[in-house]
C-alpha cells in the first residue's frame, strides 16, 4: 500500500481499501457536481474511473467547478479531469469519453463492466436513459437531483427517490421512472426550496429563453462529495463474493 492511502486504510481497513482499488466506477458529467465526485473518488483510491462529458471548460464554470481554472479554460473537461486524477493517483486507470450522454449514445457503453455508476447529468432525458441502462445491467447507480438556485449546502439528504420531497427534478424522475417500471433509485437531493431567479436570468425567462439556474461555489460541490461518499461506502463495505 502506498503512503497516500494510509489514512484511508486506517478508517476503512485493508480489505475495504483493496475493494476500492479494484473497483471500476463510471461518472457521467464532470460539472459542478461531478467534478467534486471525481476528486473524492480519486483521493479515495478507486482504481479505475470512466469519465464521460462532452463539454469544455468555460469562464462561467470558474465559480463552482473544481476542474475550472484560468489554465484549463478551453480544455475538454475529460482531458482536464484525466490530468487532475493522474496528478492525484498516477496508478488510477482513467478512460475518457467526450460524449453527450443520451439514449442515442448509450450504446457506446457496456454497463455490466462497472461496479458503480454515478449520474451527475443535468438533463432529464439523459438521466432517465442512464438509470434505465444501469437497472437493466444490474449495476448500482446513484443519481444527483437538482442543485441550481440553492444556497443551503446543509439541506442535502440521501434517500430512495420514493422518499424525496421539495425537489421538482426528483418529482419528474420518480414519475417517469415509474412509467418504466423502476420503483427505486438512490438519490442525493436538497430539501431547500429553490430561490427565485434574479437579474438577467429573470428577463430571459420572461422572454421565453432557456432559463439557466444560478449557482454557488459550495452547493453543487457538496452534492458531489455526498455522491462520492455513498459510492465509497457501498463499495468498501460490500460483502465479499462467495
PLM regions: where:
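Conserved S-adenosyl-L-methionine
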Residues: 42-48, 136-138
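Glycine-rich phosphate-binding loop and adjoining beta1-alpha1-beta2 segment
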Residues: 46, 51-89
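Conserved SAM/SAH-binding loop
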Residues: 98-106
Amino acid at each position: 500500500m502506498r503512503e497516500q492511502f494510509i489514512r484511508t486504510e486506517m478508517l476503512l481497513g485493508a480489505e475495504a481499501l483493496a475493494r476500492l482499488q479494484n473497483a471500476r466506477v463510471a461518472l457521467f458529467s464532470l460539472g459542478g457536481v461531478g467534478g467534486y465526485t471525481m476528486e473524492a473518488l480519486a483521493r479515495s483510491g478507486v482504481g479505475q474511473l470512466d469519465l464521460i462529458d462532452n463539454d469544455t471548460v468555460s469562464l462561467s464554470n470558474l465559480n463552482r467547478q473544481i476542474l475550472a481554472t484560468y489554465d484549463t479554460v478551453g480544455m475538454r473537461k475529460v482531458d482536464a479531469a484525466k490530468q487532475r486524477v493522474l496528478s492525484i493517483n498516477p496508478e488510477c486507470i482513467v478512460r475518457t469519453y467526450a460524449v453527450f450522454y443520451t439514449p442515442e449514445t448509450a450504446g457506446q457503453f457496456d454497463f455490466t463492466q462497472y461496479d458503480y455508476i454515478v449520474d451527475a447529468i443535468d438533463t432529464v432525458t439523459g438521466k432517465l436513459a442512464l438509470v434505465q441502462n444501469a437497472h437493466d445491467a444490474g449495476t448500482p447507480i446513484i443519481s444527483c437531483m437538482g442543485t441550481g438556485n440553492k444556497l443551503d449546502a446543509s439541506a442535502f439528504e440521501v434517500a430512495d427517490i420514493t422518499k424525496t420531497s421539495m425537489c421538482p427534478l426528483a418529482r419528474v424522475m420518480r414519475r417517469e421512472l415509474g412509467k418504466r417500471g423502476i420503483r427505486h433509485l438512490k438519490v442525493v437531493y436538497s430539501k431547500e426550496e429553490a430561490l427565485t431567479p434574479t437579474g438577467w436570468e429573470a428577463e430571459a425567462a420572461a422572454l421565453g429563453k432557456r432559463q439557466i439556474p444560478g449557482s454557488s461555489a459550495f452547493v453543487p460541490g457538496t452534492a458531489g462529495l455526498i455522491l462520492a461518499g455513498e459510492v465509497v461506502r457501498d463499495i468498501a463495505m460490500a460483502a465479499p463474493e462467495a
